[in-house]
Amino acid sequence: XXIENEXEIVDMHNALRRAVRPTASNMLQM
């Protein structure tokens, strides 16, 4: 359980990173 929860947290961080990367590249282009 605990391990599964950690995996879910990692997925959340990965999803957030993927969502942030395009915005960061856009900021650099600006």
From Swiss-Prot:
Q: Report which superkingdom the organism of origin falls in.
A: Eukaryota
InterPro entries, per this entry? CAP_sf (IPR035940)
Q: Name one GO molecular function term.
A: calcium channel regulator activity
What GO cellular component entries does it have? extracellular region
What is the reported tissue distribution?
A: Expressed by the venom gland.
Q: Where in the cell is it found?
A: Secreted
Q: Does the keyword Transport apply?
A: no
Q: Please give the family membership noted in the entry.
A: Belongs to the CRISP family.
The function of this protein is:
Blocks contraction of smooth muscle elicited by high potassium-induced depolarization, but does not block caffeine-stimulated contraction. May target voltage-gated calcium channels on smooth muscle.
**What protein does this entry describe?**
Cysteine-rich venom protein ascarin
Organism, by scientific name, is Aspidelaps scutatus (Shield-nose snake)
